[in-house]
């Protein structure tokens, strides 16, 4: 299944706020109206919607998300928590959380077009897994810096998650540590996502 490129507002009206996909928010109460129209939701649908929420927020294909679930399942600790950490430490998501891109698709474009360096080297793989002490910078070219400055100027000045530091005048972000689950940028019940996939096998 390919990455979603359809109408974004349609998705947030059904699934709730997806800040990685779009800065738009559903109107207050619209999700409640949708639920009342559809009646009582089945457990399968609840799990499916949580999975879709995760997939659309991080901009993943079905195959990519399944791969992350399998990696998380083999790691030590809670599968759901490890899954969120893997997704949050992707380079495209780190750029988004730093405010160097307004959405995750926007961050992915910056990476694909070779505007981003990690530890002084160009990285053009959006799924690159960032590690503690990684230094993320814009390429030292006017076009790259202008693009990121535009994002920094327009992004809401929200509190940065504790695992990141931004030096905006230097177009530089630092990864201090692996993200703590309470700083994940999406309201999600990750256990339902793990349950969804465990019931598919």
UniProtKB/Swiss-Prot annotation:
Stretches for region Disordered: 20-43
Where does the record say this protein resides? Answer: Plastid, Chloroplast
Q: What molecular function does GO assign, one term?
A: structural constituent of ribosome
Question: Which residues span the membrane?
Answer: none
Q: Which InterPro entries match?
A: Ribosomal_uS4, Ribosomal_uS4_bac-type, Ribosomal_uS4_CS, Ribosomal_uS4_N, S4_RNA-bd, S4_RNA-bd_sf
Q: What is its main location?
A: plastid
What are the protein's UniProt keywords? Chloroplast, Plastid, Ribonucleoprotein, Ribosomal protein, RNA-binding, rRNA-binding
* One biological process term in Gene Ontology: translation
HAMAP family, alphabetically? Ribosomal_uS4_B
- Describe its partners and assembly state: Part of the 30S ribosomal subunit. Contacts protein S5. The interaction surface between S4 and S5 is involved in control of translational fidelity.
Q: What's the name of the protein?
A: Small ribosomal subunit protein uS4c
């Amino acid at each position: 299944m390919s990455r979603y490129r359809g109408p974004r507002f349609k998705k947030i009206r059904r699934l709730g706020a997806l800040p990685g996909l779009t800065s738009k928010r559903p109107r207050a109460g619209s999700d409640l109206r949708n639920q009342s129209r559809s009646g009582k939701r089945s457990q399968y649908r609840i799990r499916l919607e949580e999975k879709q929420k995760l997939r659309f927020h991080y901009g993943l294909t079905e195959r990519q998300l399944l791969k992350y679930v399998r990696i998380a399942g083999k790691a030590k600790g809670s599968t759901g928590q490890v899954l969120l950490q893997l997704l949050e430490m992707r380079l495209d998501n780190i750029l988004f959380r730093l405010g160097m891109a307004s959405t995750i698709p926007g961050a992915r474009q910056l990476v694909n077009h070779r505007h981003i360096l990690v530890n002084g080297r160009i990285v053009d793989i959006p799924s690159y897994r960032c590690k503690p002490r990684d230094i993320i910078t814009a390429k030292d070219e006017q076009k790259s810096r202008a693009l990121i400055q535009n994002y920094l100027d327009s992004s809401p000045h929200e509190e940065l998650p504790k695992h990141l530091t931004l030096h905006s005048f230097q177009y530089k972000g630092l990864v201090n540590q692996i993200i703590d689950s309470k700083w994940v940028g999406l309201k999600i019940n990750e256990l339902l996502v793990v349950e969804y996939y465990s019931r598919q096998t």
